[in-house]
Each structure stands twice: as C-alpha cells, then as structure tokens.
Amino acid sequence: MKIALLKKLLVAGLVGTSFAAATAHAADLLDQVKQRGTLRVGLEGTFPPFNSKNPQGDLVGFDVDIAKAVAAKLGVKAEFVTTEWSGIIAGLQAGKFDVIANQVGITDKRKETLDFSPAYTYSSAQLIQRKDDTRDFKSLEDLKGKKLGVALGTNYMDMAKSVPGIDVKTYPGAPEYLRDLAAGRLDAALNDRLMLAYLTKNSQLPLRPGANVGSANPSGIPFKKGNPKFQKAIDDAMVQLEADGTFTKISDKWFGIDVTKPIK
C-alpha cells in the first residue's frame, strides 16, 4: 500500500514539474520583457545612419531612435546588443536579444521562421541629379546614352549594367560619385533611397533626389514566432508611434524626408 501511494505521489510530482516547465517555456515574450524591464535589441552598431557609435561611444541612428520609441511604448527601456550582420538572425533565434532593429527586409522567406512588426521604413533604388538639372529621368531606360555613377560591386551597379546603352561609371563609394555628379561629369547617380536622403541632407553639394526605380523594399522589426501577446503589443506600439507623428519626426531628423510611409 505504501509503495503504491509513493508511486502515485512521484507520478503526480513529475506531472506537476512537467506542467510547470511547459508553462515557463510557453511564457510569452511580452511577459519576459516586462519582468526584465528592458527590450533587448540586436543591431550591428556599424551601419550609419541607422545605427553606429558617436565620438562619445554612444549608439545613435534612425533604428536606435525607433527602437527606443517602441520600448518606451511597451513601458520598458531599450537595451542594445551589437552583433555582426552575418549572425544577427541566428542570434535572435538563440535568444540573445528579443528583436532586431537593423533594416531587416520583410520577405516571404524570412516570414517562414520569424514574425515581423508592421513596416517602418520603405526604400528602393533611387536616382540622384544636380539641382540645376531640369531633365526628368523617370527610369533607367531614360539614361541610355547618359553617364550614370554607381558604387563598384553593389547591386546598383548590376542593376545599371542590366540596361543596355547606359554608360555606367563605377566608383569606390558614394562620396566619389556624388562629387563627380556635382561637378557635371555624370548625368545621374544610383543608390538606396534612404542612403541618398541621408547623404543629400548632410552634404553641401548641389544635388537633389530623382526618381525611384525598381520595387519598394519594406523593413520591419523581426522577433521569434509563438509570441502573440508580444506581437500585439509591438503592433499597437508601432501604430501609435505612426499616429502621433513620432516616426515622422525621427525620419525627418535623419533623412529630411519621411521614409516611414509607403513609396508613392
């Protein structure tokens, strides 16, 4: 009798322990973030103007400000964890941080293994021209027979070279081709819309944004699947930050335009 009773108690104990472990494992990420008091944010820290360190060693940038605003809406503080891009998705899946704020494109492939916030930036390839240039290039096709500056080895170089007839000039980076464009040695240049907005905002060169070319690329904040409460909290925070103008203010601070709205 005593042995049978002991077995029942042991079984009950094991069931209880298993249930407690399963419950703890199933705890929504929102509960963990609230209990901890911080939202752990993965980013590179070497990707201006989105995230990089200032001379004082503090992380600054568009994504840094966005992450801080989202964390504040959740009632916690942002805690940043820097990591190389090559390992950032793996770091998220391993639980090294709760979310990533590093211009992660929302793609069908990534959505198979991750959940995403609503998009908070929209980018595409974009032309840039001199301010005094009255020509209106609406597509890469319009640049046939013209000189187009791009950075060597980029997808923008490949995009430009895919259109026959464009005189593609390659450069080590944006500063070099922007100087040549301003000097009249190029008809236009091609780069990422967000990067060009940042460069033109912070440059004294007489340049202006041109037409968007190619499809729009939305970016969002990814996190691990299986956290419905956290997903709703993130979604609600993003909606509020868009509605109260916070996203627009942050965007204007870094780019001089609103990159948080879909490209028209």
Task: Specify the residue positions occupied by each region the protein language model found.
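Extracytoplasmic small-molecule ligand-binding "clamshell" domains
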Residues: A26-Q103
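Short loop->beta-strand "edge-of-pocket" segments that line small-molecule binding or catalytic clefts
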Residues: G37-L43, S139-G153
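Extended ligand-binding regions for polar small-molecule ligands
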Residues: D65-K73, K147, L152-T154, P218-I257
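Acidic, polar ligand-binding/catalytic clefts
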Residues: K68, A72, K77-D142, R208
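A ligand-binding cleft/hinge motif common to bilobed small-molecule-binding domains
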Residues: G87, V104-E112, M159-S162, D180, ...
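Periplasmic-binding protein-like
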Residues: Y122-Q129, R193, A197-V239, I257-K264
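Ligand-binding clefts/hinges and TM-proximal coupling segments of bilobed small-molecule sensing domains
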Residues: N155-V168, L207-G210, M238-K264
